[in-house]
């Protein structure tokens, strides 16, 4: 009895030490994870993060005991359920998450297991004898006999994502040596500096954030302009639009000031500027003409040279 109490006290002390030392942690699911996989994950995280497992009742009791000093960790309590553990770190969260979820192993289908994604049987020659054709037909898998063996003629989805694998489907997948499941640690929730959020947040890239920000600014500016309510994103557009209106009123009222004299001159004397444009174009073409003539002469000389060889 004394040994159990000592172990609990030791666990509580270690959990508190990690909660105070590390600013971030992952709540990880460890269903169907082998001890070898856990060993590999610990090995890859060594020096960057620490893994701590424990019974949920003991973890909840420990956290509740720390709440007077560490109130932010109350947010973790709803996620301490099922087969879970903790990974503590001060390293970049995305990097640690990638290490956590990367160690996965393939596993055969079991009747009653829930498919995490669609399970397909691909078109392939199975190498099986024709006597097992009825087994495929019962599951709606199209087959033909090719060179004395059963061949699946097209891809077939045998289990939809989220559905349970039936006994027949499990038998078929195992018969074909298809291991549709992968088992490994999963990230249930992330805690970082007092905030708790799902791991999908870590998948958002900087480019996506910038894109969403630019889109939001554009939307705010459009709405602000439409309702005539000034906001920081719309002020620049408002000033430009108002200045255009000011120019239009000034020109219509023949009220000229130095900053618009050039614009007024272009409006009142368009032919002057229209004549200047062809002149500039002809000048450019005139400069190009001698260059083209020189190039043509060089080509002629080159062609003439080609008529003579060393032995003529």
Swiss-Prot record:
Keywords: Cytoplasm, Isopeptide bond, Phosphoprotein, Ribonucleoprotein, Ribosomal protein, Ubl conjugation. This is Large ribosomal subunit protein uL10. Residues 199-230 are annotated as: Interaction with P1A-P2B. Residues 231-258 are annotated as: Interaction with P1B-P2A. Residues 278-312 are annotated as: Disordered. It comes from Saccharomyces cerevisiae (strain ATCC 204508 / S288c). Gene3D superfamilies: 3.30.70.1730, 3.90.105.20. There is a cross-link at residues 14, 97, 144 (Glycyl lysine isopeptide (Lys-Gly) (interchain with G-Cter in ubiquitin)). It comes from the Eukaryota. Residues 294-306 have a biased composition (Acidic residues). Component of the ribosome, a large ribonucleoprotein complex responsible for the synthesis of proteins in the cell. The small ribosomal subunit (SSU) binds messenger RNAs (mRNAs) and translates the encoded message by selecting cognate aminoacyl-transfer RNA (tRNA) molecules. The large subunit (LSU) contains the ribosomal catalytic site termed the peptidyl transferase center (PTC), which catalyzes the formation of peptide bonds, thereby polymerizing the amino acids delivered by tRNAs into a polypeptide chain. GO terms for cellular component: 90S preribosome; cytoplasm; cytosolic large ribosomal subunit. The keyword Ribosomal protein applies. The lineage of its organism: Eukaryota, Fungi, Dikarya, Ascomycota, Saccharomycotina. GO terms for molecular function: large ribosomal subunit rRNA binding; structural constituent of ribosome. Its main location: cytoplasm. Component of the large ribosomal subunit (LSU). Mature yeast ribosomes consist of a small (40S) and a large (60S) subunit. The 40S small subunit contains 1 molecule of ribosomal RNA (18S rRNA) and 33 different proteins (encoded by 57 genes). The large 60S subunit contains 3 rRNA molecules (25S, 5.8S and 5S rRNA) and 46 different proteins (encoded by 81 genes). The 5 acidic ribosomal P-proteins form the stalk structure of the 60S subunit. They are organized as a pentameric complex in which uL10/P0 interacts with 2 heterodimers, P1A-P2B and P1B-P2A. uL10 directly interacts with 28S rRNA. InterPro entries: Ribosomal_protein_uL10, Ribosomal_uL10, Ribosomal_uL10-like_insert, Ribosomal_uL10-like_insert_sf, Ribosomal_uL10-like_sf, uL10_eukaryotes. Residues 278-293 have a biased composition (Low complexity). It is found in: Cytoplasm. Signal peptide: none annotated. GO terms for biological process: cytoplasmic translation; ribosomal large subunit assembly. The modification Phosphoserine is found at residues 68, 302. Belongs to the universal ribosomal protein uL10 family.
């Amino acid at each position: 009895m004394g040994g159990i109490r000592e172990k609990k006290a030791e666990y509580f002390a270690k959990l508190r030490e990690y909660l105070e030392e590390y600013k971030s942690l992952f709540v990880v699911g460890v269903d169907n994870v082998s001890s070898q996989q856990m060993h590999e994950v610990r090995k890859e995280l060594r020096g960057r993060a620490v893994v701590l497992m424990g019974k949920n009742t003991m973890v909840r009791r420990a956290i509740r005991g720390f709440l007077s000093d560490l109130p932010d960790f109350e947010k973790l309590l709803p996620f301490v359920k099922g087969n879970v553990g903790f990974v503590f770190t001060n390293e970049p969260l995305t990097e640690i998450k990638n290490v956590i979820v990367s160690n996965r192993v393939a596993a055969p289908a079991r009747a009653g297991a829930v498919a995490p994604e669609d399970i397909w049987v691909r078109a392939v020659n199975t190498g099986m004898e024709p006597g097992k054709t009825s087994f495929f037909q019962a599951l709606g898998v199209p087959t033909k006999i090719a060179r004395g063996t059963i061949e699946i003629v097209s891809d077939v989805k045998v289990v939809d994502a989220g559905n349970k694998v039936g006994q027949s489907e499990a038998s078929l997948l195992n018969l074909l040596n298809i291991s549709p499941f992968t088992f490994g640690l999963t990230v249930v929730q992330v805690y970082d500096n007092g905030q708790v959020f799902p791991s999908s947040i870590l998948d958002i890239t900087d480019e996506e954030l910038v894109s969403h920000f630019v889109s939001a600014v554009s939307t705010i500016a459009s709405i602000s302009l439409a309702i005539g309510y000034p906001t920081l994103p719309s002020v620049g557009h408002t000033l430009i639009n108002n200045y255009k209106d000011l120019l239009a009123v000034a020109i219509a009222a023949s009220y000229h000031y130095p900053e618009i004299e050039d614009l007024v001159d272009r409006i009142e004397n368009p032919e002057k500027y229209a004549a200047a444009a062809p002149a500039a174009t002809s000048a450019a073409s005139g400069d190009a003409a001698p260059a083209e003539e020189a190039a043509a002469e060089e080509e002629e000389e080159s062609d003439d040279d080609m008529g003579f060889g060393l032995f003529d």
